[in-house]
């Protein structure tokens, strides 16, 4: 639980708290509960939305809202209800599916569902990639632009090198998974346009690892020793595993913060 509390982003903790205090009893009725992070359509950072599926007692929930004098606002034909007092909202798409999050996140989700904004289902390549990650506890898919932004942060000063410019323009997509069933296991794959580019990216990444080892703490050096960087058939791969306690200690390190900032 301590590790979970430290790994979850503040927005997701807020969403989890709002759900628990909403009186909706989603944890009892939901068969599937998932959280998704996505880029805000307006370009203002990242939004997180929750999606739950199950046999919900919608009549009882609506009666609860009526008792609490909670009034919805209409977004097209969708009734969006405030959820608690911390700015969260919830909407029932049908008898078995609900979407919840902050007001802007719920609106963005409904706009995508109603065909008013681009949505994930229109990207056939990412839908295909999803099959390799969606069974994990935490997973992410990034398109070419998102991959470029992510790797620029990971590379740090090395992103200024000429070789990186060549690599950056040949990034197609990336994905990562995290598994907490036996310690912490992190696997990332970055798909490049060709085998040579993937090998070049792996070489650059290994160079970054060596530089950070030279200036890192013993904990950071140990983490980098446990990280395997390679390339295979046009894909850059990065794999890391550790115990829960090792990973928890790493979360506050300058190395980890420089990667996730």
Over which residues does each language-model region extend?
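A short, solvent-exposed beta-edge/loop patch
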Residues: 83-115, 183, 228-247
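Gly/Pro-enriched, hydrophobic low-complexity segments
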Residues: 116, 170-172, 176-221
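Short, solvent-exposed coil/turn segments at beta-strand boundaries
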Residues: 45-47, 56, 75-77, 91-98, ...
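Solvent-exposed, non-transmembrane alpha-helical starts
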Residues: 60-62, 109-111, 198-201
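A conserved glycine-rich beta-strand in the N-terminal activation segment of trypsin-fold
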Residues: 88-151
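Structural boundary/hinge residues at secondary-structure and domain interfaces
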Residues: 1-82, 128-166, 203-228, 235-237, ...
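Short, surface-exposed beta-strand/loop micro-motifs that present aromatic residues
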Residues: 33-39, 86-93, 174-178
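One face of beta-strands
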Residues: 48-52, 98, 172-176, 182-190, ...
């Amino acid at each position: 639980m301590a590790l979970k509390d430290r790994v979850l982003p503040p927005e997701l903790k807020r969403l989890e708290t709002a759900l628990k205090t909403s009186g909706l009893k989603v944890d009892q009725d939901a068969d599937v509960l998932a959280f998704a992070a996505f880029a805000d359509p307006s370009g203002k950072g990242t939004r997180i939305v929750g999606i739950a599926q199950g046999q919900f007692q919608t009549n009882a929930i609506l009666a609860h809202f009526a008792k609490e004098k909670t009034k919805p606002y209409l977004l097209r034909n969708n009734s969006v209800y405030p959820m608690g007092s911390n700015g969260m909202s919830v909407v029932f798409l049908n008898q078995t599916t609900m979407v919840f999050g902050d007001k802007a996140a719920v609106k963005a989700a409904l706009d995508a569902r109603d065909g008013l904004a681009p949505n994930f289902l229109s990207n056939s390549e990412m839908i295909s990639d999803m099959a390799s990650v969606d069974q994990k506890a935490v997973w992410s898919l990034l398109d070419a632009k998102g991959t470029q932004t992510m790797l620029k942060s990971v590379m740090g000063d090395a992103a200024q090198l000429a070789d990186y410019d060549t690599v950056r323009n040949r990034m197609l997509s990336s994905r990562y998974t995290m598994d907490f069933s036996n310690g912490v296991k992190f696997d990332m794959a970055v798909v490049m346009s060709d085998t040579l580019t993937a090998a070049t990216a792996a070489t650059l990444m290994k160079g970054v690892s060596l530089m950070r080892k030279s200036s890192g703490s013993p904990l950071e050096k140990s983490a980098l020793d446990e990280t395997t960087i390679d390339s295979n058939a046009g894909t850059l791969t990065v794999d890391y595993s550790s115990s829960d306690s090792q990973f928890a200690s790493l979360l506050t390190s300058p190395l980890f913060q420089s990667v996730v900032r």
